[in-house]
Amino acid sequence: MQADIVSYSNATNQVIRPSITNNAGVVIQPAVIFNYATGLNMIKYGGFFQMGKRFFDNRLGINAGIRTDMNDFTTSGSNPLRTLSPRLSLSYVLADKITLNASAGVYYKLAPYTSLGFKDAAGNYVNRGADYLRSTHYVAGLEYLPSDATRFTLEGFYKRYSQVPISVKDGISLSNLGGDFNVLGNEPITTNGTGRSFGFEFFAQQKLTQRFFGVFSYTYFNSKYSNVSGVLIPSTWDNRHLLSILLGFKLPRNWELGLKFRYQGGLPNTPYNETASRLNFITLGTGILDYTRLNSERLQAFHSSDIRIDKKWNYKKVTLDLFLDITNWYLAKSPAPPFYAFRRNADNTGFQTTDGLPVNTNGSNAVPFYLNNSDAVFAPTFGFIVEF
C-alpha cells in the first residue's frame, strides 16, 4: 500500500499584448494581460502485489504483479477497478549466453495537475471527470553476453494508449503539443483520445578492458496520438531515429579521452496559418499555428558531438583529475521551428510596408517573413576533481 498528499498551485501573470501609445502618450491600444490563479489538494493512494519464481533449473523466470491507483479528487478516482493494472514478465535462458526476455502490462497515469487544477470563471474545477491515461505495453527481446565485459540486446516494443487528454478548445491531443516547452493542459479537456507507438532498440556495451570502453544504442520508433476525430497524428517527440555512441580511451601517462556522438531524426512541426497570422500579428506579436495541419511537417535531423580530455595525478592519499569538456565541439545547429514576424524597416523604427504607409492593424500592407530559430550551443568546461 502507498499514499501521498499532493498540493498544487498555479499563479500566472502573462502580458499577452503591451499597451501602445502615440507620441503624445495617449493609449491607442490597451494592454491585454492574463491573470490566473488556482490550486488543489488531493490524496493519491493505491496498492500493489508482486511475486516471482524460477523453474526448470532456473532457466525460466516468471514475475507477475497487479496494481491499482486511486485519488480523492477526480469523479471516479476512488474506484480501484478503474485502474486495475496486471503485469507479467518472463525470462528464459535459451543457451549459455543467450536469454529471451518478454513482458506485458497495463499502466495508468493521472491527468496533468495543470488540467485537474483548471477552474472556470465561476471557480469550478471543470476537469474532475478526467480519467487516468491508460497504456498497455508489450516488449520482447534477446540478450547476448559473449563475455563478462560485452553485452548485446535487441528489443522490440508496442504500446497502445487510451483515455488520452484532448484539448476541448483545439480538438487536439495534449501529447501532440509541447515542443516549445509551454505549460500544457491549463484548459478544459476530455480524456477520450487514443495513441500508439512501436519500434525496436539495439544496444551494445563494451566495459572497460585494457584501454577501451564503448556504448552503442540505436532506437527506431513511431509514435502517434489521435485528435478529437480519432485521426492519428505524429506526436511532438516522434523523432523516428535515435542514435547514441559513447567511446572512451585510456592513454599512456594517465591521460583519458572520451567522445560522445548523438543523432536524432527531425521532429514534427506545425506550420503557421498565414492568413490568421497576418491578421493578428500586430495584436498578438506572434504567428498563429495551423492546427488543421498539426505536425504535418518535419524539422531537419540533428547531430552533435562532445569531447572530454582528462589528466590524472595519483598521490599516496589523493588523486587529482584535471579535465576539459567541450559540448558540441563542431558547432552543430539544433533545428527549431521558425518565428513568424513582420519585417522591420532599415532604421528599425517601425515595420516595413508594401505602400510606405504605417502598418495596418490587420497587417494587410506588412511584409511577413520567418525568423530562423536554429542555433548552435557551444559549451567548453574546464575543471578539476579531487578524490581522497
Model features per residue range: what roles?
Residues 1-61, 188-198, 369, 373:
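Outer-membrane beta-barrel transmembrane domain signature of Gram-negative proteins
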Residues 58-62, 97-100, 148-152, 211-214, ...:
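Repeated loop/turn-to-beta-strand initiation elements of outer-membrane beta-barrel proteins
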Residues 1-7, 47, 64-70, 102-106, ...:
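Transmembrane beta-barrel strands of outer-membrane/channel proteins
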Residues 55-57, 158-160, 181-273:
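Gram-negative outer-membrane beta-barrel transporters
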Residues 39-75, 83-87, 96-138, 158-183, 203-222, 260-284, 336:
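Surface-exposed extracellular loop regions of Gram-negative outer-membrane beta-barrel proteins
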Residues 162, 214, 263-285, 300-304, ...:
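C-terminal beta-signal and adjacent terminal beta-strands/loops
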Residues 29-42, 127-131, 151-215, 242, ...:
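Outer membrane beta-barrel strand-and-loop segments of large Gram-negative receptors
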